[in-house]
Amino acid sequence: DMFDGAVASTKTRSKNEKRFGIQIDSLSDLISFGVLPGVFVYMISGKSTASAIISSLFVLCALIRLAYFNVLEEERQSQTTEHRKTYLGVPVTTIALLLPVVYLIYSLELYTVSMMFPVLLVIQGTGFLLPVEIKKPGKAKKACIVAFGIFEVFSLIVFL
């Protein structure tokens, strides 16, 4: 997900193609970083009513954040061709780094309470909606994020 915008910006696109790209990217993000984590947490947390409510609210927070971002991004693109330098609120993609860490801790029985998953969703979902500007990572930070993701994958393979 880190590279799709960079790839898209190398292509000459009409206004409608740009708008379509924003929408389809957000739909993909909603499924990958909203619905999938929500269903995962619901399943691993014992399919309780509380985890169903929390997971549903998490998906709703991701949806609201992405829809609001789309409105802001369309407006921004109509005013400038510059690349965005900040995010408004925590990006939905951050769950892809946080959820595996929590799962690894849970799997290694370092912390056995399965409610840690719904708590993560509450914190993360709240972060999606906070009107806080977060600076976009540069190349070095992106490399660190990729390295951390690779480390997570190998850790999950080795320890599970």
Please name every model-derived segment.
Residues 1-2, 59-66, 121-130:
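Alpha-helical transmembrane segments and their membrane-interface exit regions
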Residues 2, 26, 30, 90-92, ...:
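Conformational gate/switch positions in structured elements
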Residues 3-18, 68-85:
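Cytosolic, membrane-interface loops and tails of multi-pass inner-membrane proteins
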Residues 5, 43-46, 69-76, 106-107, ...:
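Perimembrane helix-loop junctions in membrane proteins
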Residues 7-10, 31, 35, 95-102:
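Generic hydrophobic alpha-helical membrane-span motif
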Residues 10-65:
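Multi-pass membrane catalytic core of lipid/isoprenoid biosynthesis enzymes
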Residues 39-40, 44-45, 59, 70, ...:
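Multi-pass alpha-helical membrane architecture of UbiA-family
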Residues 79-160:
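C-terminal membrane-associated helical module and adjoining short loops/tails
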